[in-house]
Swiss-Prot record:
Protein name per Swiss-Prot or TrEMBL: La-related protein 7
InterPro entries noted in UniProt: La_dom_prot, La_HTH, La_xRRM, LARP7_RRM1, LARP7_RRM2, Lupus_La, Nucleotide-bd_a/b_plait_sf, RBD_domain_sf
Coiled-coil features, chain-numbered ranges: 295-356
All copies of domain HTH La-type RNA-binding, residue ranges: 36-127
Biased composition (Polar residues): 238-251, 258-274, 284-293
Superkingdom of origin: Eukaryota
Record's keyword terms, sorted: Coiled coil, Differentiation, mRNA processing, mRNA splicing, Nucleus, RNA-binding, Spermatogenesis, Transcription, Transcription regulation
xRRM domain mapped to chain residues: 425-538
Length: 555
């Protein structure tokens, strides 16, 4: 019987364990079913972005997208092209997910395969009232984004397009942007509501404040006055507290001196009291061994002095209290006025519980300012060009007399025109090879050393090379150097060798190849204002060098 009971208990335990295991598995399956990918927000973001790219406002400005649509016959574009854009890379690279997001779109339609999309309606003509619906914004932080601008300006109306110009090298914002609204009234509302430049901003729009790299324009410029007032109040309170603590800690003599400095009206009284106190001290020291009656008289006199001191303390404290009360009243009146101003500003410019110091004006006004700037720039450049021309016309040597017009014309007629040089002509026996077991000195040093015997045409040598070539003007000049090669070897340890035969022919081929490569290298072309400014900079550098030279007079 006991064995049967044990078996039944074991079977019951096993069945209970199995039930718990099954329950755990079912719970896990239920949890797995509940967990699903949250793509609702992603689908809406993808739809919003693609509809913006294919919208009328963007296609009138985006030449790349417009060219892709025009190149396709039926207007369809592969969805894979959109996945190459940076904005879409940040969202998703799944073509099926993009097609799923655009199923219910009102602007674009997807083909049956779900791989291509196109606009439902053809693109119309460009609207003519774009400038009147656009506002210009400046004094923006370096890290400004489209989302931030849309959040700020959407309080004034429906924002359809935002353009943030950036530098090509760093891709940082230039500090200004253009915001396009749906209607002209919304743009006018943005100008009235958000035009709040800070006090330290430049007076004329279009000139942006210089900020450090990746550093935003300070947004606490509006509350600067309040901060300054707060600082003033703090310093005044600190001074008053220090005076009170000092008066409590000082002894009686120090207290009298402080009252002299703080209250000029009581200066005479304090001086007389201090003199009396000193006299009484001397008397007390001289009459220490006197009778009890004298001591009683001295104590009564000292009491009088103490009473006078207490009266002075009361007067000084009353004056201080009056001054503090008057200062507090002034501060309260100033603060009330500031609060009223701040309330007005907040009511007019509050966007997301922050007052944003921006300069906002219509694009038409900005275009007028731009035209004014361009005309001023042209005028300045014309003046600079004229001054550069006048400087270049002046002769550098002032001892030369100016030629007459006839002489100059005759001179220009007689001078032959420069012909295009085809490079150095082949001459045998003019190339000398120079070698050394250590790096050779500079080109200038070698040219100066060899020019003592015969003139040098060119030194072909790079810094740090142990071998080089020197080209002379004639074979006779090269022979002179070769004859003196033992002297150079003793003096500088150089090995000089005259090239001939195949070695000479190869070196001449190398000269022609190097020259052609140098001529074929693209040069940086400077045109317009850049060219003019570079000329002006060269003239300034030359003038500075002339000014730095010492003037030496003959004895």
């Amino acid at each position: 019987m006991k064995v049967c009971q044990r078996k039944t208990i074991d079977t019951e335990k096993m069945s209970s364990v199995g039930d718990t295991a099954c329950a755990d598995l079912s719970e896990k399956k239920d949890n797995e079913k509940k967990k699903r990918s949250r793509v609702k927000q992603l689908l809406s973001d993808v739809k919003k972005q693609v509809e913006f790219w294919f919208g009328d406002v963007n296609l009138h400005k985006d030449r790349f997208m417009k060219s892709i649509i025009e190149q396709s016959r039926d207007g369809y574009i592969d969805i894979a092209v959109l996945t190459t854009f940076n904005r879409m890379k940040n969202l998703t690279a799944d073509v099926k997910l993009i097609a799923r997001a655009l199923k219910n779109s009102t602007i674009v339609e997807v083909n049956d395969e779900g791989t291509r999309i196109r606009r439902k309606e053809p693109l119309g003509e460009t609207p003519k009232d774009v400038d009147s619906r656009t506002v210009y914004v400046e004094l923006l932080p370096k890290t400004v984004t489209h989302i931030w601008l849309e959040r700020v300006f959407s309080k004034c109306g429906h924002v359809v397009y935002i353009s943030i110009p950036r530098y090509k090298s760093t891709r940082h914002s230039k500090g200004f942007a253009f915001v396009e609204f749906e209607t002209q009234e919304q743009a006018q509302k943005a100008v009235e509501m958000l035009n709040n430049p800070p006090e330290d901003a430049p007076r004329k729009p279009g000139i942006f404040p210089k900020t450090c790299r990746k550093k935003a324009v300070p947004f606490d410029a509006v509350t600067q006055d309040n901060d300054e007032d707060g600082k003033k109040k703090k310093t005044e309170l600190k001074n008053s507290t220090s005076e009170e603590t000092g008066s409590n800690n000082m002894d009686q003599d120090g207290m009298l001196e402080s009252t002299v400095t703080s209250e000029p009206n009581l200066a005479t009284l304090t001086s007389t009291v201090s003199k009396k106190a000193k006299k009484k001290r001397l008397r007390s020291q001289s009459f220490e061994a006197s009778s009890g009656e004298d001591q009683f008289e001295m104590s009564s006199k000292m009491r009088k002095v103490e009473e006078e001191k207490s009266e002075l303390k009361d007067l000084s404290s009353e004056n201080k209290d009056e001054e503090l009360n008057s200062l507090k009243k002034k501060d309260d009146s100033v603060l009330k006025a500031k609060r009223k101003r701040k309330k007005k500003l907040k009511e007019r410019l509050k966007v997301g519980e922050e007052v944003i110091p921006l300069r906002v004006l219509s694009k038409k006004e900005w275009l007028d300012l731009k035209q004014e700037y361009l005309t001023l720039q042209k005028r300045c450049m014309a003046h600079l060009k004229q001054s550069v021309f006048q400087i270049n016309q002046k002769p550098t040597n002032y001892h030369i007399v100016k030629l007459k017009e006839d002489d100059t014309n005759a001179f220009y007629k007689d001078t032959p025109k420069k012909e295009l040089t085809s490079g150095p002509e082949f001459l045998s026996g003019v190339i000398v090879k120079i070698s050394y077991n250590q790096p050779l000195p500079s080109k200038r040093c070698i040219k100066d050393m060899l020019s003592e015997l015969s003139p040098v045409a060119y030194v072909d040598l790079l810094d740090g090379d142990t071998e080089g070539h020197v080209r002379f003007k004639s074979s006779e000049d090269a022979q002179k150097v070769i004859k003196a090669r033992f002297e150079f070897q003793k003096k500088y340890n150089w090995n000089l060798e005259l090239l001939s035969g195949d070695h000479e022919r190869r070196y001449w081929q190398k000269i022609l190849v190097d020259r052609q490569a140098k001529l074929n290298t693209p040069r940086e072309k400077k045109r317009g204002t850049e060219k003019l400014i570079s000329k002006a900079e060269k003239i300034i550098i030359a003038k500075a060098k002339e000014a730095s030279n010492h003037i030496r007079f003959d004895d």
